[in-house]
């Protein structure tokens, strides 16, 4: 535990805390009560902010629906049913195309736990999660589009001009680009939970590859499949940016893109209400199913660096596994390499000199910084309140407030950003210029959307620090800001930095809210990138995509490094 640079209490305070590994609820002493009360109050304020954001969106939908109920009901027409059908169809196809190949790639990586470059491949498979969706879409177009690097090859194979991949094909390729690596990592993590005794016994019995798969690997994969497939399905039905950029027209429209079109192009609030309610219902059903399955809805993984090898692999299987791994690697690396090549081909110097680009970069940086700061503050407040309530409960069932501090941030998974933005758009359009509050909406929505990820980084560290220090802080009456600065900060600085960097990366690359509220006066880098794509300035778009991708990737890598690096004194 790091020593504390203060005259009173003495530096031995942290050492004294380490001699009390178990903490009792701080029921005695005014200091303990003040500490619990202040932490609970902070948690209540955080919950109120989340409730206001989501509740305001629902209020906007309900008010608009009540104002024009007949119009909202009439919006349930064949077009709406066609949009729902396409939303489900593209999500089902994307899930199948992502998860089924991932089974074989994950098994191939599991069967070869040690080979040169394996760790690098797994790191590359984590990169798509760090890329903004619009950057990946540009890379896919640069590779497979009508004027892409592979267009000539595809034209020669097909015997006619390559039409490009706009529409369902482009959506599927982009979804597989994001979700195949994620599925591989999740399934590989499941395979690495197989007990070592089973592998040793299989080796002693001389078990071949097929019996080992049927008796050892498949039961583990079968148990993990529903959660992985459900997570991928949820990501696909809430995919806004990919469908917006690669959909190519009304025939390839999902519910979220329909909401955007109804508000920004058609200005049909009644249809927007109907689409939003359907999107909420669909997302709620999927999240409920994921919760029942115990799926990892955040999608993070924790892969061992040097797993052990148990069974020998014959030459034929090794060759087949190598082909699978190389094909998956090429599929993932291709769009990323195309993004870099196309971006370097743009006039980056001219772009950097444009006032519009500089303003968009500054706006993105400021909004992302504020969003990340707010997300970390809300996450820390909920974490502290949850811990204080748990310590004060002693025994018996958890209270409603404790449940809320534990799972309140998870409700944002049910309500996608475009839905929250649509609700507030409808609520505020009667009060004035909705585009004037674009910065507020971008900061608040992105902050709340990043909270599930921030909580994953902050909560374990705070609980561990509380376990060590709670009793001593109660005895000495250390609470509030003094406790956070002197006692908790040394243990929390890295987790908080991890959460901040990841939340900032998510906000920088987000297009959902700014797509609704953006205007010429408020433009972020993703919004400007979309505008350049819409005006067919593809070289400029490629250059902006490269800049945005580098910044977001650097932030996520920093978050990953901060999360893995151990604090030497803790």
Tell me what each language-model feature is.
Residues 2, 6-10, 160, 193, ...:
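Soluble N-terminal domains of membrane-associated systems
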Residues 36-68, 78-192, 220-247, 274-291, ...:
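Membrane-water interface segments at the C-terminal ends of transmembrane alpha-helices
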Residues 69-76, 347-352:
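A short amphipathic helical element positioned immediately N-terminal to and/or at the very start
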Residues 78, 113-116, 192-197, 207-210, ...:
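Juxtamembrane helix-boundary/capping and inter-helix hinge elements in multi-pass membrane proteins
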Residues 119, 202, 269-272, 403, ...:
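Loop-to-transmembrane helix entry/capping segments in MFS-fold secondary transporters
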Residues 142, 241-267, 511-538:
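Glycine-rich helix-loop "coupling/hinge" segments at transmembrane-helix boundaries
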């Amino acid at each position: 535990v790091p020593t504390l640079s203060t005259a009173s209490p003495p530096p031995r305070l942290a050492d004294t805390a380490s001699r009390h590994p178990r903490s009792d609820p701080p029921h005695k002493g005014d200091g303990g009560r003040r500490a619990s009360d202040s932490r609970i109050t902070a948690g209540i304020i955080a919950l109120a902010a989340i409730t206001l954001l989501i509740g305001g969106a629902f209020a906007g939908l309900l008010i608009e629906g009540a104002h024009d109920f007949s119009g909202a009901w009439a919006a349930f027409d064949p077009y709406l049913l066609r949009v729902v059908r396409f939303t489900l169809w593209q999500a089902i196809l994307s899930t199948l195309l992502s998860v089924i190949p991932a089974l074989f790639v994950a098994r191939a990586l599991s069967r070869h736990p040690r080979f040169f470059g394996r760790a690098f491949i797994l790191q590359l498979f984590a990169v798509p999660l760090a890329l903004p969706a619009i950057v990946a879409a540009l890379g896919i177009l640069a590779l497979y589009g009508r004027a892409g690097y592979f267009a000539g090859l595809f034209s020669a194979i097909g015997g006619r001009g390559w039409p490009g991949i706009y529409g369902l094909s482009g959506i599927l390729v982009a979804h597989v680009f994001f979700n195949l690596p994620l599925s591989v990592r999740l399934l590989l993590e499941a395979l690495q939970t197989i007990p070592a005794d089973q592998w040793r016994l299989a080796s002693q019995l001389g078990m071949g590859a097929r019996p080992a798969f049927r008796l050892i690997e498949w039961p583990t994969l079968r148990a993990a499949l529903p959660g992985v497939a459900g997570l991928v399905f949820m990501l696909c039905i809430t995919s806004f940016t990919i469908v917006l950029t690669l959909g190519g027209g009304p025939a390839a429209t999902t519910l979220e893109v329909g909401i955007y079109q109804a508000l920004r192009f058609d200005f049909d609030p009644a249809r927007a209400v109907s689409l939003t309610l359907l999107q909420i219902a669909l997302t709620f059903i999927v999240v409920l199913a994921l919760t029942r399955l115990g799926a990892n809805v955040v999608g993070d993984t924790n892969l061992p660096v040097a797993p052990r090898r148990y069974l020998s692999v014959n030459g034929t299987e090794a060759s087949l596994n190598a082909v699978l791994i190389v094909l998956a690697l090429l599929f993932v690396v291709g769009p990323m390499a195309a993004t870099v090549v196309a971006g370097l081909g743009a006039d980056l110097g001219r772009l950097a000199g444009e006032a519009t680009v500089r303003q968009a970069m500054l706006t993105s940086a400021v909004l992302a910084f504020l969003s990340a700061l707010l997300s970390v503050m809300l996450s820390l407040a909920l974490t502290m309140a949850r811990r204080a309530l748990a310590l004060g409960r002693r025994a018996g069932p958890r209270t409603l407030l404790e449940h809320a501090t534990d799972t309140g941030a998870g409700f944002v998974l049910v309500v996608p950003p475009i839905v929250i933005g649509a609700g507030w758009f409808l609520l505020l359009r009667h009060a004035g210029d909705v585009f004037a509050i674009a910065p507020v909406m971008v900061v608040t929505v992105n902050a709340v959307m990043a909270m599930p990820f921030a909580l994953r980084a902050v909560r374990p560290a705070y609980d561990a620090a509380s376990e060590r220090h709670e009793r001593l802080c109660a005895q000495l009456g250390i609470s509030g800001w003094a406790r956070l600065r002197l006692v908790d900060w040394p243990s929390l600085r890295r987790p908080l930095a991890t959460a901040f960097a990841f939340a900032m990366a998510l906000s920088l690359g987000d297009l959902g809210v700014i797509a609704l509220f953006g205007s010429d006066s408020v433009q972020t880098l993703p919004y400007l990138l979309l505008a350049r794509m819409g005006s067919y300035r593809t070289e400029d778009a490629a250059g902006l995509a490269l800049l945005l991708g580098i910044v977001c990737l650097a932030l996520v890598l920093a978050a990953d490094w901060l999360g893995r690096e151990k604090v030497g004194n803790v």
